[in-house]
Amino acid sequence: HHAYVHGVKKLLLLGSSCIYPRDSPQPMKEEYLLTGPLEPTNEWYAVAKIAGIKMCQAYRRQYGCDFIAAMPTNLYGPNDNFDLQTAHVLAALLRLFHEAREQGTPPTLWGTGAPRREFLHVDDCADACLFLMDRYSDAMIMNVGAGQDIAIAELAALVAEVVGYRGDMQWD
């Protein structure tokens, strides 16, 4: 509301791909928003992001504000979080395989490895945000990503190779 009150000319809300239904087809498309149940483990975070999107759309409709919303895919890059309790998938895999190599024990990976995810470097996300601020003005949310996804099992194999881990991996 304060952006409107203070006459902000353009506002970009960054959301998250968690706004899409848990069982969304891959790759996720903007029109999948609100078409099914959210992932229960981050449902309230997703609801807060969706509320922000809807607020941008409401201010655009009611007051003509140039408020837009972008949904970056899974990001990675400098200053990533490698804490296994809170890290996102790529940083967590890097940490797991590094520790497995150092300790000589196979890592236990979560799930089956079948889900697919898309990844984007933070610098590419920043470039996309600047592009959107300069050239995009629409109520429809805009996904920001590379347009290519990878199975978690494939990603795990790539990370193991990069880290130099040559042992087995276990899926729970």
Please give the residue ranges for each predicted region:
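Amphipathic alpha-helical dimer-interface segment in Rossmann-like NAD(P)H-dependent oxidoreductases
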Residues: 1-8, 94
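Hydrophobic/aromatic residues located in beta-strands of well-ordered beta-sheets
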Residues: 10-11, 67, 107, 169
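Hydrophobic pocket-lining residues that define ligand/cofactor binding sites across diverse proteins
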Residues: 3, 60, 97, 132-133
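C-terminal substrate-binding subdomain of Rossmann-fold SDR/epimerase-dehydratase oxidoreductases
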Residues: 93, 99-172
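Rossmann-fold scaffold of SDR-type NAD(P)-dependent oxidoreductases
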Residues: 13-14, 143
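Conserved active-site helix of classical SDR/Rossmann-fold NAD(P)-dependent CH-OH oxidoreductases
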Residues: 50-57, 61, 90-95, 126-127, ...
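Catalytic helix-loop patch of NAD(P)-dependent Rossmann-fold dehydrogenases
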Residues: 5, 9-10, 18-69, 74-76, ...
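Glycine-rich "substrate-gating" loop/helix at the edge of Rossmann-like oxidoreductase active sites
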Residues: 42-45, 73-88, 111-123, 146-148
